[in-house]
């Protein structure tokens, strides 16, 4: 360029927008379009603008009339964070409340029935001595006697834990102690056994893989070790693109977590990964960030599905989809698809026709779309992600997983993530992994570092558990401002507890498989927004769900294994926050072994964690009073269940009527639709379920039992069961009789000799 005025010919700097307009050099090669644009804008401003320009001669030269005086450049735009309120649990088409209401099918309003019966009006009030204490005494009592630190034996081997137990008769205590002593030897052996795929045998099973087999299957251990040593101060040091960094900054992500620091660089190289870390450590972002970064360099004009993310539950799939959208919000051209059961099939088909870059799905609906949705195929898939991979590898998903592996291209990248990852080679062979890098950040089967684990010993008071739950929630959250998750074993229990709590004046939600998908999402969203502070759910919600600020997890029923326990309590104390879990412990050996495993984990990781394992004391006298109130409501509870069932039958009949009308009205259109197919016949499904049930119920024998069984098979007549108290008494009597007869025979022989 040639500068038109000599005044600017030798300048070492370029004049900026803040310099006086009179001093701006006139360039010979000026842009005519820009000049015309300037003129048109000046004309629009009219006479008032001319006055301002004339007055501008008297103003400071550094001030321009078209600029905001308070404007500043934000140099740290990538470090700004919005007030993130957690992930959205809304399916496609549910972006606002009106759409959601139109989308949700009509169903029975249980809260309305409970209100008609006198519930959900006022919190039940139970008189007790505890409520008469002053605030100071309450605090002292909570600090001094609510919690007792548990030793490795758990609950002090049957020592009384509270004043309520003193009223128990000595005879009952002696019987319980005798039972505990009888079970003690059995429990020691059961520590070496698997409790329905849980416990310590998983570690033993992993050792069954020989060193040569591991060397052939996995990448060299040095790769994983080096990855774990890498710690990055911020995401910029990971060499990520600016749009991805901007998306992370908008979520408040500042420093990569250990699992993210270890896995992101390796995932960007295209290598297979098997990764494990504690719950709430950022595993979803650990695989979503490298995926989005790699998709930035995809061919822009070719629409194809390149990434498949498989998850075990629908709610988790919806959450992961939202995580991906939030991270990629500033990345242009990346599309997401959701394929989960329970939601509108036609909407999903239309969305998958556009071949989104990333499809997040549950296995069953994913196979359904591959087989029956036009224009959707997986021929160009480059990355397969399995979140909660240990659950996906279990028997319930085995058939679907084998079908999916046969449909996907073999030359893909595989990323497997879980908090309780089982990296046994036998279970991973079917996934066609290529020298996967194994990255286990935390010790296996470890709870969150700031989790306080409390245990309440129920003994033989199972009938008091609903009253105990009510009293515990009221004590932990008297104002209803904390989020509390309650885990139960059965769907029926969750539903009944919701009715009981409602009649006692406590608003709670429920989440389990008997609800429709719309009801499930509605329950999660109400809980997230604190419309209901308590959510009673089955293990459906134990994995992956990341709802912010869940302060307490209550295990109303003990889980089947320690792994499931870890996933349950992992709903709280996430991402470095503090949390508390309270578990109701029965007298079964399975319950007590889980408690021992939890205490042992805390003891072994004392130097690495701030967590505690405590025994919680409760006022059983007050709980007895609450239970009397609950028992007085039994007839009302049954009436509510009957009324709800009747309303459901009416709604079902109306639905069948509408279905019949549609069949008549749109008969030709419905008959013209191609029949949907599945990879299994009905008989295959039944056989698969039977085989799965048999494999789950098969007991794993330890070395001692296996030797006894082998000896019995050889004809040595070894006992196949452990001696009971009755057997021991009978043995003692037989031994005594033998000794008596031997002594009498000796005396007779001595007399005959004489």
From Swiss-Prot:
Any one Pfam family match given in the protein's UniProt record, by short name: DEAD
Motif (DEAD box): 387-390
Compartment(s) of residence: Nucleus, Nucleolus
A GO MF term: RNA binding
Domain of life: Eukaryota
Leading EC class: hydrolase
GO CC, one annotated term: cytosol
Major localization listed first in the record, in broad terms: nucleus
Signal peptide: none
Swiss-Prot/TrEMBL catalytic activity: ATP + H2O = ADP + phosphate + H(+)
UniProt domain comment: The Q motif is unique to and characteristic of the DEAD box family of RNA helicases and controls ATP binding and hydrolysis.
Subunit-structure text: Interacts with RRP1 and associates with pre-ribosomal particles.
Function: ATP-binding RNA helicase involved in ribosome assembly.
Name under which the protein is recorded: ATP-dependent RNA helicase DRS1
Protein source organism: Saccharomyces cerevisiae (strain YJM789) (Baker's yeast)
Gene name for this UniProt entry: DRS1
């Amino acid at each position: 360029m040639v500068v038109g005025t000599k005044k600017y010919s030798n300048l070492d700097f370029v004049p900026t927008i803040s310099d006086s307009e009179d001093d701006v050099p006139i360039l010979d090669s000026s842009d005519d379009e820009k000049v015309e644009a300037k003129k048109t804008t000046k004309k629009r401003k009219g006479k008032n603008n001319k006055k301002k320009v004339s007055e501008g001669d008297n103003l400071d030269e550094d001030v321009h009339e078209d600029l905001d005086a308070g404007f500043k450049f934000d140099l740290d735009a990538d470090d700004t964070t919005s007030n993130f309120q957690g992930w959205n649990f809304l399916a496609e088409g549910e972006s606002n409340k009106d759409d959601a209401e139109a989308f949700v099918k009509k169903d029975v309003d249980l809260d309305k029935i409970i209100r008609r019966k006198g519930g959900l009006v006022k919190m039940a009030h139970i008189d007790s001595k505890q409520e008469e204490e002053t605030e100071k005494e309450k605090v002292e009592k909570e600090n001094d006697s609510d919690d007792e630190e548990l030793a490795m034996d758990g609950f002090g081997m049957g020592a009384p834990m509270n004043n309520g137990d003193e009223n128990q008769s000595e005879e009952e205590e002696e019987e319980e102690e005798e039972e505990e002593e009888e079970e003690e030897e059995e429990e020691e052996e059961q520590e070496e056994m698997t409790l329905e795929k849980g416990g310590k045998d998983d570690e033993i099973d992993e050792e069954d893989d020989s060193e040569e087999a591991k060397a052939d299957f996995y990448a060299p251990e040095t790769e994983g070790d080096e990855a774990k040593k890498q710690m990055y101060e911020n995401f910029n040091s990971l060499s990520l693109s600016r749009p991805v960094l901007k998306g992370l900054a908008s979520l408040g992500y500042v420093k990569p977590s250990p699992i993210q620091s270890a896995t992101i660089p390796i995932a960007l190289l295209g290598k297979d990964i098997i990764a494990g870390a504690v719950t709430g450590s950022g595993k979803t972002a650990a695989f979503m960030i490298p995926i989005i970064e790699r998709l930035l360099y995809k061919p822009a004009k070719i629409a194809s599905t390149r990434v498949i993310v498989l998850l075990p539950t629908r709610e988790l799939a919806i959450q992961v989809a939202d995580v991906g959208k939030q991270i990629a919000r500033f990345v242009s051209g990346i599309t997401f698809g959701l394929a989960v059961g329970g939601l509108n099939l036609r909407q999903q088909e239309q969305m998958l026709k556009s071949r989104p870059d990333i499809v997040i799905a549950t296995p069953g609906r994913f196979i359904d779309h591959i087989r029956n949705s036009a224009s959707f195929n997986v021929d160009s898939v480059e990355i397969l992600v399995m979140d909660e991979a240990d659950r996906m590898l279990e028997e319930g998903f085995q058939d679907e997983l084998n079908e999916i592996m046969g449909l996907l291209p073999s030359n893909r990248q595989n990323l497997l993530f879980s908090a309780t990852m089982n990296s046994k080679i036998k279970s991973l062979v079917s996934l066609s992994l290529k020298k996967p890098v194994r990255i286990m950040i935390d010790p296996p089967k470890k709870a969150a570092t700031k989790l306080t684990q409390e245990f309440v010993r129920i003994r033989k008071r199972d009938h008091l558990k609903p009253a105990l739950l009510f009293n515990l929630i009221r004590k932990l959250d008297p104002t209803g401002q904390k989020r509390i998750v309650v885990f139960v074993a059965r769907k029926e229990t969750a539903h009944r507890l919701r009715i009981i709590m409602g009649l006692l004046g406590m608003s709670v939600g429920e989440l389990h498989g008997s609800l429709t998908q719309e009801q499930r999402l509605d329950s999660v969203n109400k809980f997230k927004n604190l419309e209901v502070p308590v959510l009673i759910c089955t293990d459906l919600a134990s994995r992956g769900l990341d709802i912010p600020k869940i302060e307490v997890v209550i295990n109303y029923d003990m889980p089947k294994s320690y792994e499931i326990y870890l996933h349950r309590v992992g709903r709280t104390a996430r991402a470095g926050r503090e949390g508390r879990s309270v578990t109701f412990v029965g007298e079964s050996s399975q319950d007590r072994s889980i408690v021992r495993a939890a205490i042992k984990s805390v003891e072994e990781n004392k130097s690495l964690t701030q967590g505690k394992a405590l025994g919680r004391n409760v006022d059983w006298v007050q709980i007895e009073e609450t239970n009397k109130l609950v028992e007085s409501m039994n007839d009302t509870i049954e009436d509510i269940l009957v009324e709800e069932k009747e309303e459901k039958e009416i709604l079902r009949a109306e639905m069948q009527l509408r279905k019949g009308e549609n069949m008549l009205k749109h008969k030709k259109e419905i008959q013209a639709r191609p029949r949907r197919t599945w990879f299994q016949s009905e008989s295959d499904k039944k056989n698969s379920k039977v085989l799965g049930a048999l494999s789950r119920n098969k007991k794993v024998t330890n070395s001692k039992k296996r030797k006894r069984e082998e000896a019995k098979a050889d004809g040595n007549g070894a006992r196949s069961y452990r001696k009971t108290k009755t057997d021991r008494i009978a043995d003692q009597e037989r031994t005594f009789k033998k000794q008596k007869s031997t002594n009498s025979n000796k005396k007779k022989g001595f007399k005959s000799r004489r």
